[in-house]
Amino acid sequence: MLCFLFFRRFSLLCATGFLGIVLSNWTHDATAADASKTILASGSSSRTAKREAVEAIPLHRLMIAHREAVNECVRSTTLYRRLPVQTVACHPDLLEFSLHHPDSIVDIWRVLNISKLSLDSLGPDQWSFADGYGTVGTFHLIYQEKGLLLFLGRGAYNGSLAPKVLSGTCMLLVRHQPLQGEVGAVHKESLQIDTFLNMDGAGLEFVTRTLQPLIMLSASHNVHEISLFISALSEAARKNPAGVAALANQLDRVNAVEREQLAHIARTIGGDERQARLSLDEVTVNRMNFELASRWISADELEKQGPSPMR
């Protein structure tokens, strides 16, 4: 989602570079502030990067309605940003699951108490989100092929960071590919996200003059932190597949099929189906959950700090 945790607000990813990716809620320790300058510097808003991203969109394969929406977003882009390329140390099955089922990852954050963000399925490849601080919206995975996903979303923000309600459309082009590594090494993939934000007229000037630096920085941090979390989840599954499978069973906001799919992936990563299916005591499960969440400030502490966009 990401060093967004020195940030008060964040939305998804994988979701989620929509309006919500800027103004949503996760939070991080103070060390992120220094790292932010490096992360921001490695992104790009150049015409060359934008042109390459547009050329990578498979327009001829999209449904007509989606093609028109994509063309409109490209024509009327308020803000384009290629986020810094991230390296995700993650089993490929878990990465694919995370990109296609972001609601499951967000529900893990809820169970671990590290985010107030809610993300609910509206149907196949469609979700609604709310952060509890004024950001709401929907997004849709409109196209996917090996190593490429295209998301389109609508979002709105009504809160203390803006003098009026802000609304707009966001498109995310997500590309990932395996990185060459040593034999037997942890599987790694590069993750590149191009974001196109198209603000409705009332918020256009405010975003371009006031929020643009915050949007760029927040989105970059979000992707960085989400990448770190997915890597940590994959490592937890490698070391303790039964614990991650038990965690999957606690995800009350997603359907049983997704819970079992995540549990199966955890057991596959762990490499021992028999051992991974053994029951765990509550203390062991709680310890794993604590270790997985230890990098991030709790959602309860986040609530006390108020809706400031940055720490």
Where are these regions (language model features)?
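Bacterial N-terminal signal peptides
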Residues: 11-25
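Envelope-exposed proteins and targeting segments
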Residues: 66, 79-84, 91-94, 147-149, ...
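Terminal "cap-and-tail" regions of soluble proteins that handle hydrophobic small molecules
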Residues: 35-62, 173-311
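Signal peptide processing junction and immediate N-terminal pro/mature segment
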Residues: 24-36
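N-terminal secretory signal peptides that target proteins for export/translocation
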Residues: 1-7
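Short solvent-exposed beta->alpha transition segments
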Residues: 105-127, 250-265
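Hydrophobic ligand-binding cavity/cleft-lining segments
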Residues: 33-123
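Glycine-rich portal/gate segments that line the openings of hydrophobic small-molecule binding cavities
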Residues: 119-174
